[in-house]
Amino acid sequence: MFVPESDPLRGDRRLSPAAAKQLAPQALAYLGDALYEFHVRLRLLLPAQRSHQVHQSVVGAVRAERQAELLVSLLPLLTAEELEIVRRGRNAAGRVPRRLTGEYYQQATGLETLLGYLYLCDPQRLQALLQQLPVTEY
């Protein structure tokens, strides 16, 4: 996913890591969830398919179970600071949907929190990590 240095949605400024850490983990996860779904939609758009097929592929790829798997694959690449952001996100995970185990939901929330945090304060690192994640039709 192309993450521009200057983003009209974020403004022309990045937050400092200290400022981004002041945001609630749930807020960062909310942002990270939207970013990851957008990333998957961009990656699955081509080759051209019917919109229903693209939608089904995206839904499968952004499920919490899949995000939990992706987080596990990223863990060796994360810095101590990033691992702390993931931990904060996991610990802040709210009510778990019935179809999920708490562990999957917490891990998915941890990944989303990290993505939201990096979007706000380190877009190059966000892009580097997103490139490490395989986007497959699930």
Swiss-Prot record:
Gene Ontology molecular function, alphabetical: ribonuclease III activity; rRNA binding
EC number: 3.1.26.-
Primary localization class, coarse: cytoplasm
Domain of life the protein comes from: Bacteria
UniProt similarity note: Belongs to the MrnC RNase family.
Oligomeric form and interacting partners: Homodimer.
Functional summary from the UniProt entry: Involved in correct processing of both the 5' and 3' ends of 23S rRNA precursor. Processes 30S rRNA precursor transcript even in absence of ribonuclease 3 (Rnc); Rnc processes 30S rRNA into smaller rRNA precursors.
Matches recorded under HAMAP family: RNase_Mini_III
Descriptive protein name: Mini-ribonuclease 3
Organism of this sequence: Synechococcus sp. (strain ATCC 27144 / PCC 6301 / SAUG 1402/1) (Anacystis nidulans)
